[in-house]
């Protein structure tokens, strides 16, 4: 290797380290912060963050979609399916309440949806939106349970 090649390799190595340090997320504080970070992980399609925030045996329920996943692997698979149907979803917390280890959220959801609507009709890139609530239980800095409640039909009105 030439001196110039060595210099390029060193510069690239510094760039990679700088990016890694820059991208490092700040620690999350408090149960509400953990739950907010979980919602942000969904918005960013960040399976690594989701894996970090959900307890190994943590449960995520989406009551409207009849989904109940245990552990990060099942929840990440659900997330990936949702990303296929709604690649641009935006989950926005409008209010949050914390009492002990329980965090309650009010939220809105908006996306372009492709798939079957609640009536079984195939739709492509249809804009949907709606409101819902979630109840989360945090234990030892991890989400033990996260349950979503909403009327899925209202998203298609």
Language-model-detected regions and their locations in the chain:
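Short, cysteine-centered beta-strand-loop-beta hairpins and adjacent loop/turn segments enriched
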Residues: 66, 83, 110-127
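Short beta-strand edge/turn micro-motifs at domain boundaries
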Residues: 104, 129-157
């Amino acid at each position: 290797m030439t001196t110039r090649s060595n210099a390029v390799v060193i510069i690239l190595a510094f760039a990679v380290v700088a990016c890694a340090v820059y991208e490092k997320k700040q620690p999350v504080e408090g149960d509400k912060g953990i739950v907010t970070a979980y919602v942000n992980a969904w918005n960013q399609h960040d399976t690594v963050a989701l894996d970090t925030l959900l307890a190994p045996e943590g449960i995520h329920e989406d009551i409207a979609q009849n989904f109940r996943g245990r552990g990060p692997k099942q929840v990440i698979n659900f997330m990936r399916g949702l990303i296929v149907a709604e690649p641009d979803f935006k989950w926005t917390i409008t209010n949050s309440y914390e009492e002990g280890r329980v965090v309650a959220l009010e939220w809105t959801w908006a996306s372009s949806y492709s798939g079957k609507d609640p009536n079984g009709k195939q739709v492509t890139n249809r804009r949907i939106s709606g409101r819902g609530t979630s109840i989360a239980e945090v234990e030892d800095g991890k989400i033990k349970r996260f349950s979503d409640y909403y009327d899925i039909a209202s998203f298609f009105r």
